[in-house]
Amino acid sequence: MIPIRLYTMKRLSFIRYACLLFMVLIPLMARATGQIADDVIIDGEEWRLLGSPLSYNDSIYNRVDSLLPKHEDRSWSTANWSGFYGCWEIVDSCLYLKKIVVNMWDEHKKKSYVLEFDADTLRSVLGEYYTEHGIYARWYSREKLIIGRGELVTYVHGGYLRNHEEELVVTIENGRITHQEHWHNKKVMEGWSLSEGGLTKTGIQIRDSFPYDQFPEMGTKLIIVHVKNISLTSDGHFEDCDASFFKKYDNGEKEWIEDPNHPIIVALKETMRKMYPWEVIYLHGKYTISSPNPGSGFTLPLVNRQQKKAEE
């Protein structure tokens, strides 16, 4: 989640914003579902494509969709809204669509089945991309596309947010791979986690362990902190992170404080440093932690609950 610069929202009180934040986030997380990945063949071996080249371009998607059976006749789910997936192959560093597999449902027989549309059939709607190797994905460019295989090391119940034991991280420009990194990932140890199952417990521990007595000016005010880019040692010790927090001034102005030397940020990091062990994932050459929002971090409310309860 990217920090929102709330000082532009002068008509919303801080408490109203906090309520709005969680009202928005909770339904989104509840609806999120991990998406079925496309298949891709590389040097004769099967991998999983953690992205959707067909959905990258609306015109391409609509042309393909118009060729397939009506959506209401397909067997679709929240893990595959379209009801179909693509089978690809990488040949000489170029990405080709070989066929599309459509999941169907026979209402009369109460039985599922599949229909396949090969490159020759797809040629009728994607003729300008047709080659002897298949449909050349010249419409597709991506700075960072993950292609994986093997057991899952991380998994978030939404989109393609997961990591496999073995991964290729590639850059694609107009259907051609221009850069590739090959990684072997693994889960090193269990501990304090930011995964969907552990984030709540970890957040409560941070909230309840924060040294509120060092900041009497906070009183019972609620502040929102944002943490991302957590770095860990291989044996589960917290090293550092990027942190910021929301501050509301007496005159009503609001802003995010990002100064790493601010006492509240220093205290937050020290609180996290005292927590041990942290879950450790070896991912793409670094020791890190799984997160429901990889690269974006998480947002956490801090409030002195004991003082607030005493005042009540």
State where each predicted segment sits:
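Short, surface-exposed coil-to-beta transition loops
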Residues: 35, 81-85, 163-166, 222-227
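Short tight loops/turns at secondary-structure junctions
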Residues: 219-254
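Bacterial Sec-dependent N-terminal signal peptides
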Residues: 1-36
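Surface-exposed beta-loop interaction hotspot
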Residues: 173-214
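Short, positively biased Gly/Pro-containing turn/loop motifs at secondary-structure boundaries
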Residues: 250, 255-312
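An exposed acidic His-Trp-rich patch
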Residues: 98-161
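Acidic, small-residue rich beta-repeat scaffolds with periodic aromatic anchors
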Residues: 142-186, 228-231
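Start-of-domain marker
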Residues: 31-98, 102-104, 110
